[in-house]
Amino acid sequence: MQVMYALLKPGGTMICSDFHPFTKIADILNLEQPSMSYFSTAVFEGEMAHARFYEDSVRQQMPRCSYRKYTISEIINAVINNKFILKRFDEHPAWDNPDVPGEFTITADR
């Protein structure tokens, strides 16, 4: 969030949209990622984002990445603690199961 705040012009609006941390406890979006405790702070190794959308020959050449999945409160508090003015927080249904959150969007001003 520090980098986004530094890059955004004063008076500008940040729109952050990402997978909902709820996906930590179940692979509800079929992202081929391991499930873990919602509150886990573990770092794990996996494929780059969206690698599964490439052909296997390309996918195998992509470097592995380290991930740490944050809780929704960690994400929202990072927005607030980095001087953004939180304007809106929305949760969106998962693609395959509209009964659970799959993505979120945060809108905040600098």
Model-derived features: positions:
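Bulky hydrophobic/aromatic packing residues
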Residues: 1-4, 67-68, 95
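SAM-dependent methyltransferase
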Residues: 15-77
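A short glycine-rich, Lys/Arg-flanked "PGG" loop and its adjoining helix->strand segment in the class I
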Residues: 1-13
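A short hydrophobic/small-residue beta-strand
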Residues: 14-15, 86
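Acidic/proline-rich low-complexity IDRs
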Residues: 6-7, 61, 85
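C-terminal lobe and adjacent flexible extensions of AdoMet/dcAdoMet transferase-like proteins
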Residues: 74-110
